[in-house]
Design a protein with these regions (language model features):
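Nucleotidyltransferase catalytic core that binds NTPs
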Residues: 1-153
């Protein structure tokens, strides 16, 4: 039987390599929303085997590093999980263990985020019709690229 003690979830998948001020603004936004409805924010961090994120000096930014930094930023206000395959797939799979919940996918307004999350929403609406899914993009005040930061490290 599927159960949940938390009817509102804010799921945020991404690489977060490294976590930066734009990520901080976005995640903080979803934390403030979750506090209004006693919800829970879960961040899914990618753990790529092929598309490894190198710094400009040749170092590697790992999923464990990103997880640790996000936990330092947000403490117990956010649950951070490292994804085995893909953070988006983990968002798909998340619905397998809950029932009658409201799931909001957090994303930014940059790149292809909105298009990707429309696909997720269609998937959930077909496979889990009892779960209310919405996509709530957040436009960060500070447009920044994790790639640019990596190249400076």
């Amino acid at each position: 039987m599927k159960t949940t003690s938390c009817p509102y979830f804010y799921l945020i998948p991404g690489s977060f390599k490294p976590p930066h001020v734009g990520h901080f603004e976005m995640i903080s936004h979803y934390i403030s929303l979750s506090k209004k409805n006693n919800g829970k924010v879960i961040v899914f961090v990618s753990n790529p085997k092929k598309n490894i994120r190198y710094t400009g000096s040749g170092g590697i930014i790992t999923a464990e590093f990103s997880k640790r930094k996000l936990e330092e930023m947000f403490g117990d206000e956010v649950e951070v999980r490292i994804s085995d395959v893909s953070p988006v797939k983990d968002c798909y799979d998340f619905g397998n263990n809950i029932e009658n919940a409201n799931i909001t996918f957090g994303c930014s307004t940059k790149d292809e985020d909105l298009k990707r999350f429309d696909t997720i929403k269609r998937y959930y609406n077909t496979k889990y019709p009892k779960i209310i899914v919405s996509v709530l993009p957040f436009s960060v005040k500070t447009q920044i690229s994790a790639k640019d930061i990596r190249m400076e490290l």
